[in-house]
Amino acid sequence: MEANNNTKGILFIMIGMAFFSIQDSLIKYIFEEIALFELYLGRTIVQATVLISIFLITKKKFTLKTHYPFLTLLRVICFFFGFSFFYISLTFMSLAMVSALFFSCPFFMSIFAKVFLKEQIGIRRWSAITVGFIGVLVVLNPTLEDFNFFKLAPVACSLCYACSMTITKYTSEKDNIYTQLTLLYIFAVIASVIIFLISGDGKFNNFSDPTMQFIFREWFVNPAVSWPYVFVMG
């Protein structure tokens, strides 16, 4: 039974990664037409709409009450910053390089699983993870002469994602997936709206660098072009 569940889990991960690849390609295509957190807000609204539709169709019951308030807050913060780091990295790095650096995630996740979840990880898995992490170091090219700290953005994303997934694994014992998703979307909307109220008019966009413009650009400048893609990504 456990082997069958592992196979299903791997299959779902592969399907999810395929969809993420499509999303990442679309982000690289439209990032000059939209602000970072406008994109984040749009995706969240679409995903929340899908989730609400599932609730209405299946008549599933859920609650906003969590048994792990602190861990839940930490999880949604990690998700928020993790995706932000990833989106930012797509503005100045190739999709292939970002994806390669994101593969540092299994390294962090395995450490967290061992330390915090007390899971047993065999020598074969550690060997595969180590080889993968060496590949990440090769891509980073961490030499003192020309090391680019901006390349750490997808690695920071991996660290945040590994942290959030570890917390999700732990809290799933009492909090169901619908509660966790709903709280994630609520936090993302609140955080995005706050950022919009502070900088949504573009008053801090005094930069010529495309990445910094992506972060501080005025919101809703060209929604007819950007939001159809946001809808697809959601």
Outline where the language-model segments fall.
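Membrane-interface helix caps and helix-loop-helix hairpins in membrane proteins
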Residues: 88-93, 140-149
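Specific transmembrane alpha-helical segments of multi-pass solute transporters/efflux pumps
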Residues: 61-96
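Hydrophobic/small/kink-forming positions within alpha-helical transmembrane segments
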Residues: 17-22, 52, 76-84, 106-111, ...
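Structural motif at transmembrane-helix junctions in multi-pass transporters
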Residues: 32-38, 85-102, 177
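Transmembrane alpha-helical segments that form core, pore/gating elements
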Residues: 28, 37, 146-204
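Membrane-interface interhelical linkers
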Residues: 1-15, 49-74, 123, 186-233
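C-terminal transmembrane-helix exit sites in multi-pass transporters
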Residues: 105-127
